[in-house]
């Protein structure tokens, strides 16, 4: 029995590595459709509730940049169940549109936040005209894009001149002690806890692989600048376990 469990775990990890390498849009969609019922619960549990703080931090910075804008238009991409979109919607006068490729995640988002417009779609082909938004945000979703460069160019395209991209992603700490502790939790503890509550433990094997492969700090700001943004900065949060990128068109 133990051998069968070990084999299943090994197969799940290999599949996760394979998905991280291919980033098939259809596979990513299926994965998020599967985890949708337990997504919010596990997000808050596995981050110890700190994910809400990260969203609030991003929204606070966005609010300051939009002080002179009485009716900002905001697009939240890879919105999932809509938590970052809802946070951004608390900015005075903001009109928020949110987009995701998972129908199951969107069904939950619409029930939670009926005041927000939710659309099905994907980052590499945003269904909006040029210069439509003051802010484009994405919380914990950019590393799942099938084509990261194309997605960032689309962010740039739909932003108004002077507009901002706000992107939150997990970060692997640069401090060696924190890095070791983080990776032990991420690779060994997190998938096991997730497996107790989610039908798709595969998704939580994929998570650490996707974070490790994602270009971090200056590597990602270089991609943002290459995509047309005139400035791109990063702000590590909570002992460098998460990072906020802000880029201006």
Question: What is each PLM-predicted segment?
Answer:
Residues 149-161:
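A short glycine-rich, Lys/Arg-flanked "PGG" loop and its adjoining helix->strand segment in the class I
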Residues 221, 227-249:
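Core SAM-dependent methyltransferase catalytic element
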Residues 48-71:
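Conserved alpha-helix/loop element of class I SAM-dependent methyltransferases that forms part
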Residues 26-27, 101, 168-223, 227, ...:
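C-terminal alpha-helical "lid/dimerization" subdomain adjacent to the S-adenosyl-L-methionine
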Residues 73-126:
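Class I SAM-dependent methyltransferase SAM/SAH-binding core
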Residues 39, 136-137:
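Hydrophobic beta-strand segment of the Class I
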Residues 2-30:
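N-terminal auxiliary segments of SAM/dcSAM-dependent transferases
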Residues 124-135:
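A short acidic, Gly/Pro-enriched loop at the edge of an enzyme's catalytic core
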């Amino acid at each position: 029995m133990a051998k069968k469990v070990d084999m299943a775990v090994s197969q799940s990890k290999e599949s996760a590595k394979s998905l991280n390498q291919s980033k098939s849009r259809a596979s990513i969609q299926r994965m998020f459709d599967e985890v949708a019922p337990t997504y919010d619960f596990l997000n808050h549990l596995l981050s110890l509730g700190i994910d809400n703080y990260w969203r609030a931090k991003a929204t606070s910075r966005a609010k300051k940049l939009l002080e002179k804008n009485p009716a900002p238009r905001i697009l939240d991409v890879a919105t999932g169940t809509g938590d970052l979109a809802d946070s951004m919607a608390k900015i005075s006068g903001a009109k928020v549109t949110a987009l995701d490729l998972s129908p199951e995640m969107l069904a939950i988002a619409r029930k939670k936040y009926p005041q927000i417009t939710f659309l099905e779609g994907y980052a590499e082909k945003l269904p909006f005209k040029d210069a439509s938004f003051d802010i484009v945000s994405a919380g914990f979703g950019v590393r799942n894009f099938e084509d990261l460069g194309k997605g960032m160019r689309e962010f740039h395209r739909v932003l108004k001149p002077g507009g901002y991209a706000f992107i939150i992603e997990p970060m692997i700490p640069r401090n060696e002690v924190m890095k070791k502790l983080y990776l032990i939790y991420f690779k060994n503890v997190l998938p096991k806890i997730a497996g107790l509550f989610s039908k798709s433990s595969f998704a939580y094997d994929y998570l650490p692989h996707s974070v490790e492969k994602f270009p971090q700090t200056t590597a990602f700001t270089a991609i943002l600048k290459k995509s047309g943004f005139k400035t791109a900065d990063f702000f590590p949060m909570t002992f460098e376990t998460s990072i906020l990128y802000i880029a201006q068109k």
